[in-house]
Amino acid sequence: DIVLVDEINRAPAKTQAALFEVMEERQISIDGITHKMGELYTILATQNPVEQEGTYKLPEAQLDRFLMKITMDYPSLEEEVDILERHHTNTSLIRLDDIKPAITKEELLSLRAFMNQVFVDRTLLQYIALIVQQTRTSKAVYLGASPRASVAMLQASKAYALLQGRDFVTPEDIKFVAPYVLQHRLILTAEAEM
């Protein structure tokens, strides 16, 4: 139920279009036969910097379908030394037999159902809407976030609250998830990018 798409912005447009169709409709047609995706169907994607050769900028409508964007930085000195040690001692390979599930499918479905019960005060719904609306009126933003961003921020805030051991959302939850939810949905003006 989990699909990892590596280097999504290197895929041809036709492949990207098929991927985004299944993301939106949760089904795909192959040779005239429609296949429904499972209820936990999730797509994770990696992306190379756009300035690299052979990459294509993803259209805004397609980027908008991803819940969040998390940017990975280079490893710290200590982390890079650890990588070198693993390669030097040949312990960098992970055996599939050694991997243990962190959670069962049933537990994940239960958490998802519980997430739907996480309380969000109406003032916080207004707060989310206000944040997203501000992206549409800011002089620094050429293209603001769509209503899909509001829904994503709500869902991410509820999930984050649950991960913090709470059954209610706080303004801090929203502030925490906002950059991850918004960064790939906004197009800044040329002046703002400088």
Report each predicted region and the residues it spans:
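Hydrophobic positions in the central parallel beta-sheet of the AAA+
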Residues: V3-L4
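Conserved catalytic core of Hanks-type protein kinase domains
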Residues: V22, H87, I131, M153, ...
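Conserved C-terminal helix/linker of AAA+ ATPases
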Residues: T46, D98-T104, L125-Q126, G165-V181
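C-terminal engagement/docking regions of AAA+ P-loop ATPases
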Residues: T135-M194
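Alpha-helical structural signal
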Residues: Q16, L40, L63-D64, E80, ...
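Canonical AAA+ ATPase core
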Residues: E7-T15, M23-V118, K158-L163
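Conserved AAA+ ATPase small/helical "lid" subdomain
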Residues: L96-S150
